[in-house]
Amino acid sequence: MSEKIRKTLSLIESQQLAQDVWHILQEQHFKGMLPYFTVEHLCTKHQLTPQQLALKLLPIAAAYSLAPISQFHVGAIAIGQRGAYYFGANLEFASTHIQQTVHAEQSAISHAWMNHESAITDVVVNYTPCGHCRQFMNELKTAPQLKIHLPHSQNNLLHSYLPDAFGPADLDIQHFLLDAQNNQLTYETQDPVMLTALECANAAHAPYSKSYHGIAIETKDKQIYRGSYAENAAFNPSLPALQVALNHLLLSGDTLQNIQRIVMIEKANHLCYRHMAEDLVANLVDIPLDYIAL
C-alpha cells in the first residue's frame, strides 16, 4: 500500500501538502483516515476548506482501490460530523459474482461506520456517483442535507442527484444507517474473534429483512477487523458484512494475504448470506469461513 500511495503524490498539485499527508499516513501505518484535528491542521497550514482539501486528496483515496476487472479506480472521502476524513475506494473481486463489488461511496461510508462515526455531512468523490451509490447514501439520516463534491462541481445536495427519492421512510422505517443499533443477539463464547463477529451482527442495519449478520477477520498479527451488514430500502444496494470487513481491513493498510481467520455470525430470517460469503472467502483466501448460525 505504501508504494501505491507514494506513486499518487505527484498527482497532488502542492508537493508540500503531498509530503505532509505522506508523513501522516506513514506514521499511522497507512490507515486511510484523518482525524478531525489533523484535517483542521492541514486546512489551516495550506489555507484550504475541508472540502477543498478532500478534493486534493482523492488520488490518495483512489490508491486503495482494487479494480482487476474494470481497471477504473474510484476514490471517495466521507466527512464525519466533527470533520474526520474516512477514505474509500472501489473494490472488485475477479472470478466471482459482480454483485460482490464495493463501490467507493459505500467503501467510505462503511469505513466511517466501522470507526464508530455516527453521521456523514459530505461525500467527496472523483467521479459522479452512480445510481446504486445515490440510493445507498439515501439510507443515511443526513441524506436530506448530505452534500456531494466532485472535482468539477461542489456543494450539490444528494437529492439533486436523486429527485423524488425512495428511502426508509417509504417503508415506515425511522432507523437509519450509522444509527446506534442493538439487535439483542446472544452467543456464549470467550473467543475474541467470535465476540467481535457477534458485536457486529448486533450492530447490523437490517430493518427490512430482520436478518442480521456480522463478520470478524483476524490477521496473522492478531489484528481484528469488523464488518456489519448494511441493508438498504431498495434492497439491491445493500452491503454484506464480509465486504464491509474486507473494506475495513484494506482501508486500514492491511492486506488480504495477512488474513488467517474469518468468522461469520448470522441470525437468518428471510435472507441468508452464508453461501455468498463462502464463495468470496474461497475466492480470496485459502481458509474456510467459520460460520455460526443463531
UniProtKB/Swiss-Prot annotation:
Family the UniProt entry places it in: Belongs to the cytidine and deoxycytidylate deaminase family.
List of residues binding substrate: N90, L91, E92
Name of the gene encoding the protein in the UniProt record: cdd
Entry note: cofactor: Binds 1 zinc ion.
Gene3D superfamilies recorded: Cytidine Deaminase, domain 2 (3.40.140.10)
GO molecular function: cytidine deaminase activity; identical protein binding; zinc ion binding
Cofactor: Zn(2+)
Active site location: E105 (proton donor)
InterPro entries recorded: APOBEC/CMP_deaminase_Zn-bd, CMP_dCMP_dom, Cyd/dCyd_deaminase_Zn-bd, Cyt/Deoxycyt_deaminase, Cyt_deam_dimer, Cytidine_deaminase-like, Cytidine_deaminase_bacteria
Biological process (GO), any one: cytidine deamination
Signal peptide positions on this chain: none
UniProtKB keywords: Hydrolase, Metal-binding, Zinc
Phylogenetic placement of the source organism: Bacteria, Pseudomonadati, Pseudomonadota, Gammaproteobacteria, Pasteurellales
Keyword Transcription regulation among record annotations: no
The keyword Transcription appears for this protein: no
Residues binding Zn(2+): H103, C130, C133
Protein name, UniProt field: Cytidine deaminase
GO cellular component, one term: cytosol
Domain CMP/dCMP-type deaminase: 49-169, 188-294
Subunit structure: Homodimer.
Domain of life: Bacteria
Pfam families registered for this protein in UniProt: dCMP_cyt_deam_1, dCMP_cyt_deam_2
Catalytic activity: cytidine + H2O + H(+) = uridine + NH4(+); 2'-deoxycytidine + H2O + H(+) = 2'-deoxyuridine + NH4(+)
EC numbers on record: 3.5.4.5
